[in-house]
C-alpha cells in the first residue's frame, strides 16, 4: 500500500517533529544584553551552561549564543525572573523607562515576558500599577513593588498574576518614609498584610 518512499518521508517527518519537541523543552534562562543606555536585548540562554550566574547581570557570557532575543528600545533598570503565573517556567520581569499613550511622561514601567517553545513572548506590558513604580522584585508567588504616592510617601504592595495581568493582592506598608518602605521591600521575612 505505502511505497518505500512514503515510509521514509513519514519517518523523516516524525523524527523532525520529535526532535523539534525535544529541543523546545531544553531548560532556558533569561538574561539581558545591554548595547547602550536605550537599547537592550532580552535573551533566552541555555540554562545548563552557566549555572550560578545571577539573572540579569547585563552581559551575555562570551561565546554564549542566545536561543531567542527580544529587542527593548528603552532604558532598562531591572531584570528579575520567577514563576509569576505558576506554570513551572520562569518568566522575565523587565523594568523599563518609557512614556505611554495615557501617561506621556517617561516613567518606570513593568513588562512581563514568558518562554513559549524556545521563543520570548510578551505576557503583559503594563503602563501603570496602583502608584508610581520605583522598584520591583519577585517574591514567590508575588511581584513585590515599591511605589511612591503623590504626597511623597512610599508603599510596598504585592501583586499576583490573574490571566490578563497583575492584580493587587495586599499592602505590606501604609504610606511611610522611603527608608521604612525600602527596608520592608528588601526584607525576606514572611510578610503580613498591612
Task: Give the predicted meaning of each segment.
Residues 21-194:
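Beta-propeller-forming repeat regions
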Residues 11-17:
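Bacterial N-terminal signal peptides
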Residues 2-10:
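Bacterial N-terminal signal peptides that target proteins for export
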Residues 1-2, 15, 83-86:
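A general, composition-driven signal for non-globular sequence regions
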Amino acid at each position: 500500500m505505502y511505497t518505500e518512499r512514503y515510509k521514509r518521508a513519514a519517518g523523516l517527518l516524525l523524527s523532525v517533529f520529535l526532535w523539534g519537541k525535544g529541543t523546545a523543552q531544553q531548560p532556558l534562562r533569561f538574561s539581558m544584553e545591554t548595547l547602550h543606555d536605550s537599547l537592550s536585548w532580552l535573551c533566552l540562554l541555555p540554562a545548563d551552561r552557566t549555572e550560578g550566574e545571577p539573572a540579569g547581570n547585563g552581559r551575555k557570557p562570551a561565546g554564549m549564543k542566545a536561543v531567542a532575543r527580544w529587542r527593548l528600545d528603552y532604558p532598562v533598570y531591572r531584570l528579575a525572573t520567577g514563576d509569576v503565573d505558576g506554570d513551572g517556567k520562569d518568566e522575565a520581569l523587565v523594568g523599563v523607562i518609557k512614556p505611554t499613550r495615557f501617561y506621556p511622561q517617561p516613567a518606570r514601567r513593568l513588562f512581563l515576558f514568558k518562554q513559549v517553545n524556545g521563543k520570548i513572548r510578551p505576557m503583559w506590558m503594563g503602563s501603570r500599577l496602583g502608584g508610581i513604580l520605583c522598584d520591583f522584585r519577585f517574591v514567590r508567588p508575588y511581584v513585590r513593588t515599591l511605589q511612591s504616592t503623590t504626597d511623597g510617601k512610599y508603599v510596598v504592595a504585592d501583586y499576583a498574576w490573574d490571566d490578563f495581568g497583575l492584580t493587587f493582592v495586599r499592602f505590606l506598608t501604609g504610606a511611610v518614609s522611603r527608608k521604612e518602605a525600602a527596608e520592608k521591600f528588601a526584607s525576606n521575612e514572611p510578610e503580613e498584610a498591612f
